[in-house]
Amino acid sequence: VSTDADANLGTTAVREGFAFDEAALADWMRSHVDGFAGPMQVAQFKGGQSNPTYRLKTPGKSYVLRRKPPGALLKGAHAVEREAKVLVGLEQANFPVAHVYGLCTDNAVIGSWFYVMDMVEGRIFWDATVPGVSRSERAAIFDAMNAAMAQLHGVDYQAVGLGDYGRPGNYFERQIARWSRQYCDDTDAGRDPNMDRLIAWLPANIPANDDATTITHGDFRIDNMIFHPTQPRVLAVLDWELSTLGHPGADFAYNAMMYRMPPAIVAGLAGADIAALGIPGEADYCAAYCARTGRAAMPAYDFYMAFNFFRLAAIFHGIKGRVIRGTASSAQAKERVAVLPELMALAWQQAVKAGA
C-alpha cells in the first residue's frame, strides 16, 4: 500500500454541484485555525462518502474538510456535528484521531455545515490480508488494531463530554428492532427466509445481564485506520459516521467479522492462510481483546456475530431497494446486491453457531 494519502484516497477537481466560495472558507480558516496561511488549493476526495470530503492544501500543511451535502437532507442524516463532537472528545482521551480545528454551523460560509481537521499522512490497508509488509509487521498491525479497539471501549465517555452521544442501555433490542423494521418496510427489495428466521430468533436470544455501554465506532475495519508510514502504529481511526453509545461486544465482533467474511463481500479473511500470513487466529484475537479490557471471556460472542451479520445484511438489503428504485446506481451498489443472498445465508449460519 502506498504511504501517499493521494494514492490511497485519491483526490480530484471539485465535482459539479460541490464547489463553494473558497475565499469565504479562507477567511473562516484565518479566524479559526491557528497558524493557517494561504494560498489554499481545494481538491475533493473520490469515493461515495455521504458527507463530501475535501483536501485543503497550503504551502505549510494540508487539512481535511467534511461537510453536509448541499440541498435538502433527511433529518438526522449527514450529522457532521456529531463526527466533530466525537473526535474532539476522543482526542481529549488521547485516542488516535485527527485533530479538529473547528465546526462551522453557519450555512453562509460555504452553503452547509462543515468541520476542518488535520490531514493525517500514513498508510491505509484496503485489503485485510495486508499485502506488502513482512509477516512480523502484519502480526503487529493486527495487534495495534486490537489495542485501538480496546482503548476506544475503555474511554470514560462521560468525562470527555460524550454522555449525551447516544442512549445507554438496551442496545441490541433497539438495533434489532430498527433494522428489522427497515428490512420489512422495504418491500421492493423483497424477503429472504434466512433474514425472516433471524428477525424471529435474535430478539428472543439477547444475552441476559449484558448491558455494557461504551463509545462504539460502528464500522471498525482495517481500512478505516491510518497507520504510521513505517511503524505498525495507529495514527488515526477514520469514518465516525456510525459511532454512538453502544455495546462494546457488538463493536468488537463487527471488527472480528473479517475472520468469517469471504473477501468478495467486504474485506474479509475467510479462506486466507492466516497462519502463513502471521495474522492471529480468531480465538487469539478475541482473547487479546478480552485481556486488554479485563474480561475473562466473551460468552455471547457468537450472538454478537449473528447480530452483526444481520445488521450488515439489512444495510445491503436497503441498498438493493435503492438499486431497484433507481436511486443507487454505482457499480459498488450493484456488487453489494449480488452478494446479498450469500450474506444472508452466512448471517443465519452465525445464529446456528450461537445455538439456533
Indicate residue ranges for each PLM-predicted region:
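Juxta-kinase regulatory segment immediately upstream of eukaryotic protein kinase catalytic domains
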Residues: 2-36
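ATP-binding pocket architecture of kinase catalytic cores
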Residues: 39-201, 205-215, 229-231
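Helical subdomain adjoining the active site within ATP-dependent kinase catalytic cores
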Residues: 296-298, 314-356
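All-alpha amphipathic helical-bundle segments outside canonical DNA-binding/catalytic cores
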Residues: 166-167, 296-308
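Catalytic-loop of the protein kinase fold
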Residues: 215-217, 222
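Active-site activation/catalytic loop segments of kinase-like enzymes and analogous catalytic loops
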Residues: 250-293, 307-326
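Activation of the activation-loop gatekeeper triad in protein kinase-fold domains
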Residues: 238-243
